Amino acid sequence: MAVPRNRHSNARKNIRRSHHAKKACSAAVCSNCKQAFIPHTVCASCGFYKGKAVITVEK
């Protein structure tokens, strides 16, 4: 099993982890109902995806 030769300092550890933060997901605008939704998914308010009705949504 591999064992590190020397101890890594807290600064070195934190520099390595500086890229581990979660990215905020962007929002797209639905072309049918103009509501915000997550890209590459069906719009939750109207049920359209790429201009086509995919699911029926009760209002």
From Swiss-Prot:
UniProt keyword terms in alphabetical order: Ribonucleoprotein, Ribosomal protein
InterPro entries, A to Z: Ribosomal_bL32, Ribosomal_bL32_bact, Ribosomal_zn-bd
GO cellular component terms, semicolon-separated: cytosolic large ribosomal subunit
Pfam families tied to this protein: Ribosomal_L32p
Residue intervals passing through the bilayer: none
GO molecular function: structural constituent of ribosome
GO biological process, one term: translation
Domain of life: Bacteria
Region (Disordered): 1-20
Family (UniProt): Belongs to the bacterial ribosomal protein bL32 family.
Matches recorded under NCBIfam families: rpmF_bact
Official protein name in the record: Large ribosomal subunit protein bL32
Originating species: Chlamydia trachomatis serovar D (strain ATCC VR-885 / DSM 19411 / UW-3/Cx)
UniProt gene name: rpmF
